Every structure is written in structure tokens, then in C-alpha cells.
Amino acid sequence: MLSTKRKALDTGLQRRVRARRESSEEIEESSSDSAPSEIGRDDNEEEESSSDETEDEVEEEASESEEETSNDAAASISFGALAKAQATMSKPSKRDSKKSKKSNADGWEDNEATERKAGKKDQRDFTRSSKNAPTEISSKKAVSRRREVVPVKKREIRDPRFDPTHGPVDMGKIEKVYDFLVDYREDEIKKLRKTIKKTKDEDEKEKLKRDLLSMESRKKTDAKKRKAREILDKHRKEEKELVKEGKTPYYLKKAEQKKRVLLDTYGELKGRQLDRVIERRRKKVEGKEKKNMPRARRVVE
């Protein structure tokens, strides 16, 4: 492109120089022949018009050469490069996308209809003016478009051993079948006690102690349940024998069952052991009563 421009400019300069020479010769001839001033003026006008024409021709030639070179450059570009350029031009910039998002967020506040669309969350700012001010929540909550035409029951995974179709669960039989688990738990408790004595890390020791405490508490609860079940079974057997004799059966209430369990567990205790148990029970009951009391009445004057 540069070479063609230079050539065009060189030709233009040459033409201009020629025009100037002709004008100088004409001026000399006019001065020697003593021509009138009007003829000289006409010659000057002709010279100016010729110089303008030459300049226009030079510009036209330069533009034509530039067009030719640009066409050659476009023809040499590969289709892959053109496709990439087209893709980059078609993609929206990050700034434009951010602006569109901001405009959507502003439009949400103005348009209430869009707020009611299903699946859309309320994007308005509900920040409180102060920590003591009440929280503001939008009442325009989106309702889902999905509706249950035919209600379908949810599939429940259940254990066939404890299925209600087989009748009520007999805990006595289950305990007899899984009685070996009690021995396993006893062995685990013994092993835990040994490991607690051996461990030197305090954090690990605390963790093991917590595990031991939970296992022992579970063992105690299981023993209580077993004792309560034994008392109930004993009562049922007695009632069955009385029914055979022709008497009406007497069903124990839950409160009566608890009383009998307490009498059975603490009836054999005497002296200090009984006092300790009674004191522990009293504190437990007091704690429960305090929890149920309102805050104003908890403090005893």
C-alpha cells in the first residue's frame, strides 16, 4: 500500500512541476509581447483549474490503489479467522450483561406481576433500619404451579419383622432372640474401661469417657424396661388365673405400673441407701417443676 501511495504522489508532483514551468514560460512571453492584463488573468485561472484537476486525479488514483490493496488483504484472510471475528462481535460484553442484570433487579421492584411468578425469589432489600426495628418480609410469596391432581401415597420402607400386619410386637420374644447383644455390650464396656486407663491423651480420654457413660446409661434404661416388662407379665399371669376362677380382669394403668416398678427396685433398700435414692428423686422432681414454671416464679424469695 505504501509503495502505491508513493508512486501516486511522485506522479502528482511531476505534473505540478510541469504546470508551473508552462506558466512561467507563458508569463515571460506575455511580458516580452506586452500583452494586456486581462489575458494574464485568464491564463492564471486556467493554470489553477489545471492544478486542481491534477490533484483530484492523484487522489482518485490513491483511493483506487487503497481499495485494491484492501481487497487483496481480505481475500488472503482464512475462513477460520473470519468465523472467530464474527463470534467475538456477536458475543455481548461483561459490562452489558451486568447492566442488563441491574436493570432486571430494578424492574423487579417496580413490577409486582413478575414477583408473583413461580420459582422466583424476592430480591428486594429488607434490611432493618436498626437492630430494634422489626424485620420486613414480603407478603407476595410465589405459589408453585404444580398441583396434585391424583394424590399418590408415599412409599414407605419398612422392616418385615416388625410389620403391623404380623400383629403386635412381642418384646419378650425379641429380647430372647437378640439376647447375645447384651453380652457384646458388656464386653465393649470392659474394653473401654481398659483403654481409658491406658490412654495418656486427655482429649481422647474425655471422648472415651463420654462413650462409656452413654453405654452405661443405655444399659440402665434397658434394665429398667426389662424389669417393668417382667412386673407386667407377672400381673397378667395372675389375672389370667383369676379369670379362670370367674373373676373380672384388672388392667394396670401406667401410673400404677410405675409405682410397682419403684416398689420392686427400692423396696429392698434400707438405711442410707434408701435416703440417697429418695433425695435424688426429690431433686429430679424439683428440677422438672422449675422448668415448667414461668420465669417470674422460678426465683424463690
Curated annotation (Swiss-Prot):
Gene Ontology biological-process entries: maturation of SSU-rRNA from tricistronic rRNA transcript (SSU-rRNA, 5.8S rRNA, LSU-rRNA)
GO cellular component, one term: 90S preribosome
Locations listed in the record: Nucleus, Nucleolus
Region span, Disordered: 1-169, 199-232, 282-301
Keyword Ribonucleoprotein: yes
UniProt keywords, alphabetically: Coiled coil, Nucleus, Ribonucleoprotein, Ribosome biogenesis, rRNA processing
Bias type Acidic residues, positions: 43-70
Function: Component of the 90S pre-ribosome involved in the maturation of rRNAs. Required for early cleavages of the pre-RNAs in the 40S ribosomal subunit maturation pathway.
Protein family (similarity comment): Belongs to the RRP36 family.
PANTHER family for this protein: RIBOSOMAL RNA PROCESSING PROTEIN 36 HOMOLOG
Name of this protein: rRNA biogenesis protein rrp36
Lineage per the UniProt record: Eukaryota, Fungi, Dikarya, Ascomycota, Pezizomycotina
